[in-house]
């Protein structure tokens, strides 16, 4: 703490604080209790909680995209699973480390994602898109940030690369159902270069023999 305090500078006129950062890596320890995971059968006969938050700056085509992929669903659970399956199967994974994906989950980023020829994004963007699609169907959903769990007991070391985002839907009286719309990380887009069309050479009439 003393080292961090020595490296902290504050600009009164800019109302900005700047730190030189820690000299070494920081680590944190915590304990938690994992909630019980519910089976789909527990949610099948329960309607999801209604969403009435009123999202602002929603990317265009979110409503129609959700409607297209939930048209045959008979329950809120089936709607959520249908959207999850669509994104997980038809989408491609790519993070901000590549030229195929931009970081963040702003309106512009999600709008470009769904208007492109193929869905390309990371877990944060897929979770955001799924939550917006569920909201358009009146289903209360939230984006959750966390990490993949390995095992049910004991300690585990987590780093930034272990962080993940997924979606949870509220079912009153039962709990929150978990949905992971992110495609597998090895399901990445490929850039296909079309071969140039061959142009036939014009035929040239040969002069008659003398």
Set out the residue ranges of the language-model regions.
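Structured beta-strand-rich cores of soluble
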Residues: 1-73
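Residue-identity detector for glutamine
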Residues: 4-5, 25, 85, 107, ...
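Alpha-helical structural elements
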Residues: 5-8, 23, 46, 88, ...
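Juxtamembrane membrane-insertion context
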Residues: 8, 39, 50-54, 92-96, ...
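Residue-level signal for pocket-adjacent positions within structured domains
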Residues: 13, 46, 105-109, 153, ...
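Active-site neighborhood of thiol-dependent amide/isopeptide-bond enzymes
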Residues: 72, 76-165
